[in-house]
Regions:
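Glycine-rich beta-alpha junction loops
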Residues: 63, 182, 214-219, 265-266, ...
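Short beta-strand-to-loop capping motifs
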Residues: 188, 215, 303-307
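Gly/Ser-rich oxyanion-binding loop with an adjacent helix/lid
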Residues: 9-21, 25, 116-196
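ATP-binding N-lobe of GHMP and related small-molecule kinases
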Residues: 2-132, 154, 337-340, 347-348
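Glycine-rich, charge-dense phosphate/pyrophosphate-binding loop(s)
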Residues: 13, 25, 29, 250-348
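Acyltransferase
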Residues: 205-288
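A generic local secondary-structure boundary/capping motif
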Residues: 29-31, 55-58, 166-168, 172-176, ...
């Protein structure tokens, strides 16, 4: 049974993937499921930029949202039955109906492939803090893409998963490590009529680990972006290029260079007014020899360090955080890089 594709979904579906609607009637949606399915997803937090790798470098953290999805063919062909249960982060803030980001993204992907949204029950145990620069929205988009992969007959190819999620998210620096794990360099190919994203994996040095300082304050990604200048001096750009190149070497081969490699000249200083306490903590940690940066759009602080220094870093981080002179409070947390990205376990 099929029905007309709503206009807003036709628009949202445009450009998701070059072959998104191949083989499907342009104005028809149909049921994707022949029987009910149930599966469990585990999606890691992420940290993007890593200092000089603005909108390019990102890594996955072993700190995960756990989601269970039950899907069944629609009982009512005119409207799906959708229910979302959220525990943990965002439990008192996130919608529990079809307006939830995961549901709207799944609906968007399915519509682009020619299918309607089936009946869905989503139970989310959220651990990733929201609006802290730790990839909570990328985790939601990853959940949506992998849910769609389970629902679409034949699934989504690895390339479709890369392009669809990156286009919905807008940039791949958080999304790619959430999907695939580890550390990644991602970029947008030039001279393409539609956004075309590419990525290359990096294997981090076995001694590299992470320490986070998670503040009680939140930060809008868009508000942080709005503070950036239209252009920067050529000298600053050149310095940043050298540090970004060095960071690839440091994080994979020579961790002793991480402090120099994480110097940023493109975004952090311009955003200082948005999270002064976080920047003060970054300054103190870097002054003590730790490779501290703002995680993503902030305000969380990330330190890339050798495992042997992680405990002392967390201790120092807690002491420095109490001395910033600001009202913000920070919770130190040591986390390894997640070598595995999002996982899916089919339950039936």
């Amino acid at each position: 049974m099929s029905r007309k594709m709503p206009a807003h979904l036709r628009k949202l579906g445009q450009g998701l993937a070059p072959d998104a609607a191949a083989g499907a009637p342009a104005e028809q949606l149909r049921e994707p499921l022949a029987a009910s399915v149930r599966f469990r997803l585990s999606v890691p937090a992420t940290s993007a930029n890593l200092g000089p790798g603005y909108d390019t470098l990102g890594l996955a953290l072993e700190w995960r949202d756990e989601i269970e999805v039950s899907a069944a063919p629609r009982r009512d062909p005119e409207k799906p039955a959708v229910h979302v249960v959220v525990d943990g982060e965002g439990a008192d803030q996130l919608p529990t109906d079809a307006s939830h980001l995961v549901i709207t993204a799944v609906e968007r992907i399915l519509a682009a492939k020619g299918y309607w949204l089936p009946d869905l029950q989503v139970n989310a145990q959220n651990a990733i803090p929201h609006s802290r620069g730790l990839g909570s929205s990328a985790a939601a988009i990853t959940t949506a893409v992998l849910t769609a992969h389970q629902l679409v007959p034949g699934g989504l190819s690895a390339e479709e998963q890369l392009q669809i999620g990156s286009r919905i998210e807008g940039h791949p620096d958080n999304y790619v490590p959430a999907l695939r794990g580890s550390v990644a360099v991602s970029w947008q190919a030039a001279d393409t009529p539609e956004p075309l994203f590419k990525t290359a994996p990096l294997t981090p040095h076995p001694e590299v680990t992470c320490v986070l300082a998670v503040p009680n304050s939140v930060q809008s990604t868009q508000a942080a972006r709005d503070l950036l200048p239209v252009s920067v001096p050529h000298e600053q750009a050149a310095k940043n290029s050298s540090r970004a190149a060095l960071l690839v070497h440091a994080i994979t081969t020579e961790p002793a260079l991480l402090l120099d490699a994480t110097e940023d000249y493109l975004h952090q200083e311009y955003r200082r007014q948005a999270f002064p306490a976080s920047m003060a903590l970054v300054d103190q940690l870097r002054g003590a020899g730790y490779a501290a940066v703002i995680s993503g759009a902030g305000p969380a602080v990330l330190v890339l360090t050798e495992a042997s220094r992680a405990a002392s870093c967390a201790e120092l981080m807690g002491r420095f955080a109490a001395e910033t002179g600001f009202d913000d409070t920070f919770s130190p947390k040591s986390l390894p890089i997640a070598r595995t990205g999002a996982t899916v376990e089919v339950l039936r």
